């Protein structure tokens, strides 16, 4: 795969993830009786986890795919949106701001997106 093909393939995935994060944020209704663990985990499995995975995949496998700044920020913003929604499912109102690299390193260390979210957001308390 050429660099251009890789950039286009990853770009399309990033665009879909960013659009879904925007939709999830717009549709979010705080749980009436937090925590809503199932919804929190869904935001991780269907959102933050795939966003981090795109970053990891692009940085491994022998090909260092470059993301233009707007795509990188869209992917990082989507991940942070889902981490914010995850915390909100526990009744915690916060705007998180982590780098994809921080999250990717944690994912590689823990192999568990729920652990990554707990470490980054502090939710739920341990």
List each language-model region with its residue ranges:
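Acidic, polar-rich N-terminal leader regions of halophilic archaeal proteins
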Residues: 1-126
């Amino acid at each position: 795969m050429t660099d251009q093909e890789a950039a286009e393939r990853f770009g399309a995935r990033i665009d879909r993830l960013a659009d879904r994060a925007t939709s999830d944020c717009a549709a979010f209704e705080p749980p009436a009786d937090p925590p809503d663990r199932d919804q929190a985990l869904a935001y991780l499995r269907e959102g933050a986890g795939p966003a981090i995975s795109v970053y990891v995949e692009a940085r491994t496998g022998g090909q260092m795919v470059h993301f233009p700044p707007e795509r990188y920020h869209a992917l990082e913003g989507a991940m942070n949106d889902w981490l914010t929604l995850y915390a909100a499912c526990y009744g915690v109102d916060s705007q998180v701001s982590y780098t994809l690299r921080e999250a990717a390193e944690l994912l590689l260390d823990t192999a568990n997106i729920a652990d990554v979210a707990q470490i980054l957001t502090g939710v739920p308390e341990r």
